[in-house]
């Protein structure tokens, strides 16, 4: 079995930065964005005796024993962070697999590539483990993994744009509601 997932990168059109804490909690925020025909891809092949992370766009790979995936640092922090959270949140037993990712634009490009990668990887794991996650669940969980588990800075528009795609107007309120 091969599981494939992809999520679109986004172009911010207006309101960028108003989705970032603490601004959005104090004043609220609103953004306008559109997804474009550039993507983050994730492919999972279950099985084997070790876990392999491969980032084709960075020409990097890391092989580890399945029970030692925990610890989310370096080039594979997003992929490992998503896996760690999925295993712990849904009470799953770690299993060996190969995860290959590719992003059409590098981190720091301003297109939400890191968050889009988180959404694509989460989508692939959700499919593999048949997790009961809807679109809002995926966007919220991807945001929580990046901001709280991994300590990455940023707002919320990237995860929601990558999950829903298309042309988006989003409002953010002090209670965390999108």
Residues of each region from the PLM?
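Short, solvent-exposed loop/turn segments at the edges of secondary structure
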Residues: 36-37, 164
């Amino acid at each position: 079995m091969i599981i494939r997932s992809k999520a679109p990168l986004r172009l911010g059109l207006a309101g960028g930065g108003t989705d970032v804490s603490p601004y959005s909690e104090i004043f609220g925020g609103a953004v306008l964005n559109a997804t474009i025909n550039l993507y983050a891809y994730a492919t999972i092949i279950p099985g084997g005796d070790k876990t392999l992370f491969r980032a084709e766009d960075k020409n990097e790979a890391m092989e580890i024993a399945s029970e030692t995936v925990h610890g989310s640092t370096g080039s594979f922090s997003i992929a490992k962070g998503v896996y760690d959270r999925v295993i712990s949140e849904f009470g799953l037993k770690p299993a060996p697999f190969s995860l290959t990712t590719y992003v059409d634009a590098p981190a720091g490009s301003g297109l939400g590539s890191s968050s889009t990668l988180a959404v694509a990887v989460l989508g692939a794991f959700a499919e593999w483990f048949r997790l009961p996650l809807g679109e809002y669940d995926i966007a919220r969980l991807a945001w929580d993994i990046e901001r709280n588990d991994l300590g990455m800075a940023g707002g919320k528009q990237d995860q929601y744009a990558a999950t829903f795609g298309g042309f988006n107007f989003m409002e953010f309120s002090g209670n965390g509601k999108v």
